[in-house]
């Protein structure tokens, strides 16, 4: 079966889920997790996308992202950039990611808040921490500043 064609440009905000190859817990080591965060934040600083929320779990990641390129290119940079560096810098051999990813366009403020809460609560739901702020590989970490909610998603009382 062919992969779905996505023609998404940078005009939307998306909830993303991508899994490791065969759901292996490849991202549970601190070295792999820190490298992933470095790649994720590096491409953000290069203005390839706006990053609103994220969590890196042992076998997958979730993002709330507004691509400034196409969605496909943003995910190619993240997944491909991480794979390249993991193999080069950490000597990893083998497949890291499943080929596809799940995306859902965020339509409104309520969806944005629901996805944000889901991302922040994911480590708690998986019994990795008691509160989201204690999980070191997420945007819930105190003091981490990410990109603001896109204006088009804000309710009118927050837009003013």
Indicate residue ranges for each PLM-predicted region.
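Short catalytic/metal-binding and nucleic-acid-binding patches
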Residues: 1-160
